Structure formats: C-alpha cells, structure tokens
Amino acid sequence: MDGTLFPGDDDLAIPATEFFSTKADKKPEAKREAIVKADEDDNEETLKQRLTNLEKKITNVTTKFEQIEKCCKRNDEVLFRLENHAETLRAAMISLAKKIDVQTGRRPYE
C-alpha cells in the first residue's frame, strides 16, 4: 500500500472522463463533426445556423424561467392559503377547548 486511504488522496489529478462522458466521446472518430470556429472565412450559412441554434437555446431557457416563475407564484399562493387555514384551525381549537372547559366545569362561564 502506498499510503493513500482514499482514491484522490494522493493529490493526483483524476481525469474528468472517469466521472462522465460527452456525446462526442461516444461517437466514432469518423462520425464526429468538426468544430467550427468563428473566423472571417466562415460563410453566412454557418453563422446563420449557429445564430439560430443559439436563439433556440436562449428561447428554451427563457421559457423554462417563465414556467419556474409561474410555479413559484402558484406555490406562494398555496402556502399563503395554508398558513391562513392553519391560523383558522388554531383559533377554532382554542374556542373548542374553552367550550369544553366551561361544559366540564373546569372554567367558569364568561
């Protein structure tokens, strides 16, 4: 044993591929798409395609944020109603306890 109790305890860098793999790693070399860099040589089609892809992703993110906002708003309303309901139940239980105390003679009628 070389003195390490846990993997990674020896301060050696663990490659990230041990924890996850990307879609590009799963594709064979022949089917992988080449990475396109934004240079002056790029034609308009490639730039338009990249912009539309970016636009789609941004639209998806904003849609998800809107859904999250609606969900949080709905949860806030439900929580408010539950808090009011709990307060109403507490008041009803107190009045019931007073009524029982009066009827059993533990407390004088007020």
Curated annotation (Swiss-Prot):
Protein family (similarity comment): Belongs to the orthopoxvirus OPG154 protein family.
Q: How does this polypeptide assemble, per the annotation?
A: Homohexamers, covalently linked. Interacts with OPG144 and OPG153.
Which keywords appear in this protein's UniProt record, sorted alphabetically? Coiled coil, Disulfide bond, Phosphoprotein, Virion
For the keyword RNA-binding, the answer is no
> This chain belongs to which protein, by name?
Protein OPG154
As for subcellular location, the record says:
Virion
Q: Which GO terms describe its biological process?
A: fusion of virus membrane with host plasma membrane
Q: Tell me, what does this protein do in biology?
A: Structural protein involved in the envelopment of mature virion (MV) to form the wrapped virion (WV). The wrapping consists of the addition of Golgi membranes to the mature virion. Participates in mature virion (MV) movement within the infected cell. May play an indirect role in MV-cell fusion.
* GO terms under cellular component: viral envelope
Q: Which organism is it from?
A: Vaccinia virus (strain Copenhagen)
User: Pfam families under this entry?
Assistant: Vac_Fusion (PF02346)
